[in-house]
Curated annotation (Swiss-Prot):
Protein name, UniProt field: Outer membrane lipoprotein Blc
Keyword Lipid metabolism among record annotations: no
Subunit organization: Homodimer.
Acetylation as UniProt keyword: no
Keywords noted in UniProt: Cell outer membrane, Lipid-binding, Lipoprotein, Membrane, Palmitate, Signal
One Pfam family of this chain: Lipocalin_2
Lipidation (S-diacylglycerol cysteine): 19
Assigned protein family: Belongs to the calycin superfamily. Lipocalin family.
Gene that encodes the chain: blc
Species annotation: Escherichia coli (strain K12)
GO terms for biological process, alphabetical: DNA damage response
Principal location: membrane
Described purpose of this protein according to its UniProt entry: Involved in the storage or transport of lipids necessary for membrane maintenance under stressful conditions. Displays a binding preference for lysophospholipids.
Amino acid sequence: MRLLPLVAAATAAFLVVACSSPTPPRGVTVVNNFDAKRYLGTWYEIARFDHRFERGLEKVTATYSLRDDGGLNVINKGYNPDRGMWQQSEGKAYFTGAPTRAALKVSFFGPFYGGYNVIALDREYRHALVCGPDRDYLWILSRTPTISDEVKQEMLAVATREGFDVSKFIWVQQPGS
């Protein structure tokens, strides 16, 4: 029975470390000259690597707005066809350094933060490639529910160059896709 507190403490320590890495993966370059105000608004999730907190969701969007404390509000929303209902989670994000560098930490659960790193972004802020704290988390985002094949190939090329396995992408069902 004395083992249970030790296992609980080790698990808690692991979760704090695993969920608190706000840095990009080693060797991944984030966008510089980032303008958070231009990034605000709604983005459609075009593709993602599979993970439990979005598993099975379609019509996924992420909406960003400014917080009074200088951070960003984050509202992620997706439709769960198995349950026939919308699911939504609200979080907050803060820059890990200069606000002109697109490296943020984001939290949807209390004091636990993970990395949110914009690694590709077109000049018009229409398409973005975002990764988490390691190469297991990657998203293609767009201001519209669909993207051209040219944009898709550009994003796949950047992801491959940055060391991501693009065969892991799940292409999200969006209106018109």
